[in-house]
Amino acid sequence: WILMSDKLGKSNPWYARFNVLLFLWVGVGFFTGWKQYSLSEVNSHINNFQIFRSSFGHFFQQMHLYPLYPKEYFDLYLYGPVFAVLMAPFAYLPLGWSVVLWNGLNAGMLFWAVWNLPMVRMHRVAILWIILNSTITALLNTQFHALCVAMILWSYILMQRGKLGWSALLIALGVFIKFYGIIGLAFFFFTKDRLRYSVYLVFGFAAVFAFPFLFGGVEYTWLCYQEWLEVLSHKNTLNVDIRNLRTDVCVMGMFRRITGDGTLSNLWFLVPSLCLSAWVYFQPKKWALLDFQLRILALVLIYIMLASTGTESPTLIMAFPGVGIWFVLGEKSRTRWGWFVLTL
């Protein structure tokens, strides 16, 4: 019913009511946080959150952010210094409360972003149901990616509403947390006030970049930025190892595993795909059209996962809002239904 209808009609069915959806989404966030915390071995079920939470203490004690700390968590911290500073509220709360609120924040912000997309209500409702399962997967891993895609959606929404300063700030924040926010720059040509947007972007990037220096000092924070780039390069090397079945779940990774060639370069796929995307994007007469903007939004959300060596099951929430937008905007043909079902 949700996916086949474009209008609510006179009725307001339970599955489309704002209060029902809000309760469901925030409830899912709180419940998954509580569930993962309540399981016996804490580090094995909320490990990602432990990494995020511990980064605050490491930063303010001026410890290296990016080595392994096996007594605290496993895996590596892969986020920028600004993220460590912003984890302050969660670091001071008791662990149980903080992980519940973390998941609630991720779920709530993504819900609120989708609900504010410039689309008819039934389309927004359909997208919320389409992405719910992948959101739960991300929440069960206490990941950041639901909040990350919410920030990207909000950077578009705010740009579309003319609030260019806030849009630019969110793009900058996304870049300096985990680079994914860079795709928000795809919305640059959708505003007529590009000069003002450019100024906001410059100031936004400068402000977010400089923010950690206020707390860590120049020498230590600069070292953190250098080590961040190094660990991302190291992580990419680990991701493309064909013996690692968890990550590199992208187009390039698929071909690396099919051919058994772990040295297959990403450029063979990135260059032609970026050229094709640019050909689709650079249609200036369509930049002001809402339908075109939404389709580009869907494109960049899906593309970032298809082309990232860091793609794994919990990160797919980054792409699924794009899948939802793509599906609801098009005619519900058998082909579209087939691709949609295959994607799910």
Residue ranges, per PLM feature:
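Short, Lys/Arg-enriched N-terminal segments with co-localized hydrophobic residues
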Residues: 1-3
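Primarily membrane-embedded glycan-assembly and transfer machineries that use lipid-linked glycans
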Residues: 5-166, 191-313, 320
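Short glycine/serine- and small hydrophobic-enriched flexible loop segments
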Residues: 88-91, 187, 325-328
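Transmembrane helices and adjacent periplasmic/lumenal helix-loop junctions
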Residues: 171-189, 308-318
